[in-house]
């Protein structure tokens, strides 16, 4: 059994090495198709310098792209770590305090500090005067006094309110 296992492992190792070589050859063929070697024969000094400048510019652009990609991936990893810490509860959340804002401050916060809006929110409200309320209460009081007169029972009510009560 042991010999069979070693033979299988040796065969698998040879196949892995062969696959690795095939991958390397495929990579070389692919890169050769993407970036053909520059033809430098028959070029003058000025043309060679121009070619070098062009290649240098391409390399600089690729470096910037790589640097930006690295920064983005680093920031994404940091944000993910912070999310995990918040979800895990190890990150201390600050205690939030209630802040009272006036209407002007709220509008400034919503519209931005550039817009100065002095809106008076009480302008649309109806104003009630105390005089009107007092007149209504007087009218109600007068009406209650006249209930007996309007009901037509003035005389009969007096009989019941008399000291003798009308009986007897």
From Swiss-Prot:
GO terms of molecular function: actin binding
Bias type Basic and acidic residues, positions: 128-147
Coiled coil region boundaries: none
A GO CC term attached to the entry: troponin complex
GO biological process, one term: skeletal muscle contraction
Gene3D superfamilies: 1.20.5.350, 6.10.250.180
InterPro entries (alphabetical): Troponin, Troponin_I, Troponin_sf
Keyword annotations from UniProtKB, A to Z: Actin-binding, Muscle protein
Region (Disordered): 128-168
Role: Troponin I is the inhibitory subunit of troponin, the thin filament regulatory complex which confers calcium-sensitivity to striated muscle actomyosin ATPase activity.
Assembly information from the UniProt record: Binds to actin and tropomyosin.
Family label: Belongs to the troponin I family.
Name of the protein in its database record: Troponin I, cardiac muscle
């Amino acid at each position: 059994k042991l010999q069979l296992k070693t033979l299988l492992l040796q065969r698998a190792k040879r196949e892995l090495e062969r696959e690795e070589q095939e991958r390397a050859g495929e990579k070389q063929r692919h890169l050769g198709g993407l970036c053909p070697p520059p033809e430098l024969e028959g070029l003058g000094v000025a043309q060679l310098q121009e070619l070098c400048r062009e290649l240098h510019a391409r390399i600089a652009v690729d470096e910037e792209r790589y640097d930006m990609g690295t920064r983005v991936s680093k920031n994404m990893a940091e944000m993910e770590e912070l999310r995990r810490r918040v979800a895990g509860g190890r990150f201390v959340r600050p205690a939030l305090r209630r802040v009272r804002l006036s209407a002007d401050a709220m509008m400034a916060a919503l519209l931005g500090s550039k817009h100065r809006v002095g809106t008076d929110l009480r302008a649309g409200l109806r104003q009630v005067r105390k005089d009107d309320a007092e007149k209504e209460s007087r009218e109600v009081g007068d009406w209650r006094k006249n209930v007996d007169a309007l009901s037509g029972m003035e005389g009969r009510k007096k009989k019941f309110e008399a000291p003798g009560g009308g009986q007897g």
